Design a protein with these regions (language model features):
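N-terminal hydrophobic targeting signals that begin at the initiator methionine
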Residues: 1-2, 20
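N-terminal intrinsically disordered, low-complexity segments enriched in P/E/S/T
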Residues: 21-270
Length: 270
């Protein structure tokens, strides 16, 4: 009788263990920290304009490079990546200290190069998106373009880029719409684009040969975020250079003390 009871207990324990393993597979729970927490919105806003409205997302005006603190590696150097991330992608990533301080972008389909080991800092580069509809789109880092010295609206020399350089690779088009960070937009014809510049520090356009005849809201378009291209006859077949690292607009580091940051429990099966 005792042997029978012992056998029944043993069978129950084995059944319980089997069910437990089935219901709870081997999982490792680790903490991740959303990357957007490491990019201070006020610092970015003030860099764009000290008088800028605080309720707008100025971090969307930049491309983001993730850099290793040990060997300086970034996805820019990888043959499988070779680019920086827009805010919409970067902000959804995580910093995971328990996984060799790597960055994770779960479910986003990014190349493995973006899983940067010992991630230590982020470099920000001012960019503009150019959207030619079904002809494709480009993310263009402004400091990767040729710069020119142009008089700004205070009659002081300032670095600027040609507006036409943002449309390199498009054979012809009918018109464009400039879109600001707040969604405000204005249409421009090719002759204005070919004449105009974007002042990199003032964050405003100027059209040297047309300023005297243009209304203020056209000649001084501020905080350019995007260009919509209408009537493009071709895709934008041009390989834009990334901005040099030494010309990064802003840099943020990951602190060693993360006690002031919100963590997210992340689950991965081993």
């Amino acid at each position: 009788m005792k042997k029978l009871i012992y056998l029944l207990v043993l069978l129950l324990l084995l059944a319980f263990t089997a069910c437990s393993e089935k219901d709870n597979p081997s999982e490792v729970k680790i903490l991740g920290y959303k990357l957007d927490q490491f990019i201070n919105p006020d610092t970015v806003r003030i860099h764009i304009d000290t008088q800028a409205e605080a309720d707008l997302e100025y971090r969307s005006l930049f491309a983001y490079e993730i850099v290793s603190s040990t060997d300086g590696f970034s996805p820019r150097q990888s043959a499988y990546a070779g680019y920086d991330l827009p805010w919409e992608t970067f902000s959804q990533g995580y910093y995971v200290p328990n996984d060799d301080h790597r960055t994770w972008f779960p479910g986003m389909g990014l190349p493995s190069a973006f899983k940067v080991r010992n991630a230590g800092l982020f470099r920000l580069y001012r960019k503009v998106d150019v959207d030619a509809g079904n002809r494709g789109s480009k993310l263009i880092e402004l400091r990767g373009l040729s710069t020119y010295t142009v008089d700004n609206w205070s009659d002081t020399a300032e670095d600027a880029i040609k507006l036409s350089d943002l449309l390199q690779g498009i054979a012809a088009y009918d018109s464009v719409a400039f879109v600001a960070v707040d969604g405000y937009s204005k249409n421009y014809q090719p002759e204005l684009i070919n004449d105009g510049y974007y002042l990199l520090n003032s964050e405003v356009t100027t059209f040297p040969n047309f300023n005297s005849t243009l209304p203020g809201n056209m000649k001084k378009f501020k905080k350019l975020a995007k260009i919509n291209v209408y009537g493009a006859t071709s895709a934008q077949n041009f390989d834009f250079a990334l901005a040099p690292q030494e010309k990064a607009d802003l840099t943020f580091t990951i602190p060693s003390d993360l006690s002031g940051f919100e963590s997210t429990e992340m689950v991965t099966e081993k």
